[in-house]
């Protein structure tokens, strides 16, 4: 049988939501930890610590949302020095990336011998993404990684269906994530609910902790959080995110929409046509730009590609070549607009160029970022 589903780059989705929040006045702090939370008169006294400098700052908040994911219960225990009201059950899922197993843009849903379903999904242009596993996790969250038995498990199911047989040497990359589910004693990990739960803290000032949830429901989850906090913010407006494109996705504003809102009835075909229109416009504006680079920029940044391209009038305006098709102009953009601070931010969290850039390129990129950040710090001082 055949059905339709959606695919998203989760790390870029997070960044784009942060960008949209900043556009609406949010103060976005990356690499910043909440180290203390004290209840004051009508507000929380929040102590924040910046990771690289260790500098602490105290801010006041009318409400706090604990959206720490798998750290949700640990954070509560750390801040209040007592066991949180709900326990979390951590379930790890891992994926492997291998050379492309099949042609076409369809994904495959395979059933393993244990009855579990595994997906094989076209990934970037040259790879297949295989996953996910599912297992209880009691390790160190900061160093979560795939186990060899998980790799063997995923290879086994793929080899049971595809003519091209995989070996351990075919695994190009791996990644693992941990779901913070509510602990339902006695239930197998595969049976525990994936639904989200909002748990209010017993305090006069609102503190809401989020348990569970998944990327497909993140927006409605956020709306439910805001609904719960509405009494604290009486001037809060009506929900608006359903019809609001994320940064880079406002094609309808340029090609027939109004007020930056999505046009009702616009489908994937219309969006693809809009992207093709913008691609043609930018190709005419910058005929010197490599077709493959423009394609990647459009897929990654959408309409923000125009901001990235800016007033560049030749290939030399792209700046230093840092490996693959990464130039310093893009790195500067990511530092200025997407809070990138280190090579992993650039190569894995904002793009997926980590698959293409060699160790020398990574070292050159690290040196460049260090130089840019040092110059920025000197200028700020």
Describe the predicted segments one by one.
Residues 54-63:
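Core beta-strand elements of the Rossmann-like FAD/NAD(P) dinucleotide-binding domain
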